[in-house]
């Protein structure tokens, strides 16, 4: 392994909204975006991590449970491409996007780390909703 390409987690963020009335609550996409901003700020990078976010070349989102099975579908529809939406919101214009499902959170993190270690990626965002 190239010692200059050791992947590290530089920031984490989690957002929940258990107190808002349903009609006033944030959408799953807004909650994800808020978590991304918290993770960027947690990184300690300048400008609350804005440059770090713009430099993302990979954005992955774990598929929402409500989008998995029709019987759990939200009456408000589903997110067609949450990773793309997050990439656009944070200015990561060159990021590839991927929706991943199942119990694969750690697999996705491992893949992101592997791609960084191999030089295929510079920075990656992994998250769910």
What is the predicted role of each segment?
Residues 1-97, 113-121, 125-129:
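Conserved "HGTGT" condensation-loop signature of ketosynthase/thiolase-family condensing enzymes
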Residues 106-114:
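Conserved phosphate-binding catalytic cores of ATP/NTP-utilizing and phosphoryl-transfer enzymes
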Residues 30, 104-107:
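Glycine-rich anion/phosphate-binding loops
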Residues 98-103:
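Short beta->alpha junction loops
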